[in-house]
Each structure stands twice: as C-alpha cells, then as structure tokens.
Amino acid sequence: MFKGDMNKKRAKALQKVKDAIALHGGQTILSTGITGDDARLAKAVCEAGVKLLEPNHPALALARGHKGVSNMHAAEQIRHEITNGQMAEAVHGVRNVVPDDIFITVGIAGGFTETLPVPLSDTEILEIARAGADGLHTHKSDWDDLQDIVNLAHQYGLTVDAYIGHPDDLHTFGIPARTPEEVSSVAKRMQEIGVDMIGLMTGMSYEGVAAGDIPQAIKDRLRALVGAVDVPTLAEGGINLANAKAFKDTGVNILVVGTAIDNMVCNAAKEAVTPFIAH
C-alpha cells in the first residue's frame, strides 16, 4: 500500500473530526446505534448537524435481529458473528447518502475484545476502507492487540479510536486503568503507539448512575485523560439527555451516544403509528 497516499487519507479523516469539534464549540457527538447503520436515519441526523457516525457490529446484530437479540447487552454476546461483509455493506450504504465531510468510524468483528477468535487481516481492513470508512472504532484490552490494529488501520488510511476501561467494568471495552493516574499513563502510551483518538468508558451503560449527573470519579478520570494527550478525546457509556451537560466541564471533545438515541427513535415510531391504529 502507498504510505503517502494513506497518510493523506488519514489526515483528511482526522481533520473532519477536528472541524466537527470546532463547529460545535469544543464538544460534539459521535452518533451510533440505529443512526450509525441505517442509511435513512444516518442521513437524518447528519441533516440535523451530526458530523460523526459509528456503525458497529453489535448494533447491526440488533438491527438485523440476529439470533433474536433485542437489547445491546445481548447483542454484545454474539457481535462476533456479524461478518465483515455485512459491516462493509452497512457502511457503504451510509456513505452513499451522507456528505463527504461526515466522519465514519466503524466497529467490526475482531476490533473489540471478542469472546471467540476473530482474526483481522489486510483483507478485512481494506474492505472496510473501500466501503467508505474513515476510521476503526476499537475496544481492544491488550497492548499488543491494539498495536496490531493501529498498524493495520494506518496502512489503509484509517484512523483508530481506542478506549480506556476500568478493571471492574461489567464488559471489557478497553485497556484497564483503575485510578486517574493510571488513566493518564495509559492515555499517553496510546498516543505514543499511534492511536488517533482516545476515549474513556464511563461504566454507566450497565452499572447505572444517578439521573442528571455523572459520578465525580468519572469526572476525575476524564480530566486525567484530557490532560494527558493532544489527540481528540471521547467519553462512551450511558450518556443521555439528562447527563450530557455534566460532561461539558470535563473538557472531553466527543460524546459517544447510541442507546439514548435508539430509545428516542423507537418511542417516536410508537407515537407516530398510534393515531393510525387508535382512530
């Protein structure tokens, strides 16, 4: 692969992210879930101002009703069964209907900490890149695995967003770091090995948190992340309308929002059809 060409491709992708952050006053959202893999809804949220999208394999398992899963917790257990070809098809459809300045980062089987062996090779990464992806959304929990992903992605002009988790998290979604000091250390090392965007898993998706706020411990961890690196930063897990504003003073650049939007879209669909069957 031509190194110069792919470096230029990746730089263009990163500029999309930086432009989105600037456009939205220092903090924007990465819209995922149902808005990441359904071309109609992806187009709709982009028309509303969203600039960053994330199709991923557990969300596509939900969208396809794979093995009857009906919630993200269940989808995480069988996400590795969603093929790279299925993800590429979803990405290609979304890319076809959104403007070129929209950044698309993609979660694929093998890119997360999977429960069964899922090898990733040049073939899979090239397929995703050609489908229209700008980056890989990853959740590796081992340094060697993460380095391999970074090397593969960069070879084909894709950015990598990787995440820091907590050793006690219900699901393993990143390199573990228990204290803010460890978060800072892990983030710095991620930047050193070439990760383009670094996120923190809040742990709020499944563990729960008081409505309208985020725990002080998470604020401290986010500030440690933000203060440690120069690359764009993200927060993921349990973010909704009630607590989104609480992230503002942490300095994090991007809020990853999926389930909250999914729930609103599903509720809107229920409200839309009710008058037709209740007249």
Protein language model annotation of sequence segments:
Residues M1-A11, R178-S185, R221-V229, N240-H279:
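Alpha/beta catalytic cores of nucleotide-metabolism and tRNA/nucleoside-modifying enzymes
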Residues V50-R64, E127-D145, M197-A210, T250-A272:
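Glycine-rich phosphate-binding active-site loops on the catalytic face of alpha/beta enzymes
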Residues F2-D5, L41, A48, L52-L53, ...:
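Active-site beta->alpha loop and helix N-cap motifs at the rims of alpha/beta catalytic domains
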Residues D122, M197-A242:
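Active-site/ligand-binding-proximal alpha/beta "capping" segment
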